[in-house]
UniProtKB/Swiss-Prot annotation:
Residues 126-153 are annotated as: Disordered. This is Protein PYRICULARIA ORYZAE RESISTANCE 21. Involved in defense responses. Contributes to slowing defense responses toward Magnaporthe oryzae. A metal cation binds at residues 12, 15. Residues 1-68 form the HMA domain. It comes from Oryza sativa subsp. indica.
């Protein structure tokens, strides 16, 4: 069973979130069984059935910027060292002990100093040192706001030259519509073609051309007297003139050669 001890600054919210995300992604791939976060000592203990060297290299590649150190251990926490026993005291040899003196010339031991009756030190009324405040958690950086869109440019007024001063009042100075372009002049009418000579020898009446069609019947009685069809009425009927009177008998006439010889 492999054990990794990763040293990371868990007080930093970004480092904490980064190492949790990386270990969460590698949990199934490397069979990580247990992950312990020691916030006080800034350590992360990873346990599981994995190759510690391969997992160590993978974590360095994924989160190398926030990791301070990675240790590969067999047992965690490490066993405490045995307490140090003081060396046994050597007994002084008996020969070194001073022997009591039985003579009267020995000096008497000095008297013990009397206890001091001075005033006891007054207790200190200073303020106790306050514990260090924890740094505020790092706030995630806000994504940069997109730059505000520029307003569309205002339409520029085109200045048109005009005579100065302008006569007053001058209606429609700016409201006049755009003048229409001049129309092209109309084409001149075509001259009718002259009639072509038919080339026939009839002097008075030409038979080369077909006769015009007869006028349509107007449906009137035929007299065209009070008809509104626009056709002139027929001329009135005229009786034949009376025969010429024979010449008087006294008139001289030439003999008719064809007459009978008896007459």
């Amino acid at each position: 069973m492999g054990i990794l001890v990763i040293s990371v600054d868990l007080q930093c919210c970004r480092c904490d979130a980064k190492i949790r995300k990386v270990l969460g992604c590698l949990e199934e791939e490397y069979c990580i069984e247990k992950v312990e976060y020691d916030v006080k000592n800034n350590r992360v203990i990873v346990r599981g059935k994995f190759d510690p060297e391969k997992l160590c290299k993978k974590i360095w590649c994924k989160a190398g910027k926030i990791i301070k150190e990675i240790l590969i251990v067999d047992v965690w926490p490490p066993p405490l060292p045995p307490p140090c026993k003081p060396p046994p005291c050597e007994k002084p040899p008996e020969d070194c002990k001073p022997k009591p003196c039985h003579c009267c010339s020995c000096e008497k031991p000095k008297p013990k100093p009397k206890p001091c009756h001075c005033e006891k030190p007054k207790p200190c009324h200073c303020e106790k040192p306050k514990p260090c405040e924890k740094p505020p958690p790092c706030k995630p950086e806000e994504p940069p706001k997109p730059p505000p869109e520029k307003p569309p440019p205002k339409p520029e007024c085109k200045l048109v030259p005009y005579p100065y001063p302008v006569p007053y009042p001058y209606a429609g100075q700016w409201c006049c519509p755009k003048p229409e372009p001049p129309k092209p002049p109309p084409e001149p009418p075509k001259e009718p073609e002259p009639p072509k000579p038919c080339g026939c020898s009839h002097a008075f009446v030409c038979v080369c051309k077909p006769a015009p069609p007869p006028p349509p019947p107007c449906g009137c009685s035929g007299g065209h007297g009070n008809c509104g069809c626009g056709i002139r009425p027929w001329p009135p009927q005229v009786w034949p003139p009376p025969p010429v009177c024979p010449p008087p008998p006294w008139c001289y006439t030439e003999d008719n050669a064809n007459a009978c010889s008896i007459m």
